[in-house]
């Protein structure tokens, strides 16, 4: 199947299902709209999937890892070298977020989007756009 064929096969979201999902959430014992964006997203997923029984499986927590140049001003508890250590711990399943994710049945995916380290961290997805930000007291942090 080509991309064009795949795109043509996508049907518009069902407005009838959207209204049903909204009514369903309005009947839950909670203030109307109190779940904010989460509630809106579940309603949109129901309308797009064609089912009120929304399933969010598999679950994943994507952690974007990066370093800030302002660290050199001494405003943090640790230096930038700790970011790579924490990201590596996440990749091994040894971090607080990993413990919570296991309880929720979610995977943790650490992604290097701007860690200051030069070497790849095993198990961390490399999508680096820069080696950390600049110190914003000296220059724009990101350009």
How would you label these PLM feature ranges?
Residues 1-143:
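N-terminal loops that bind phosphate or other acidic moieties
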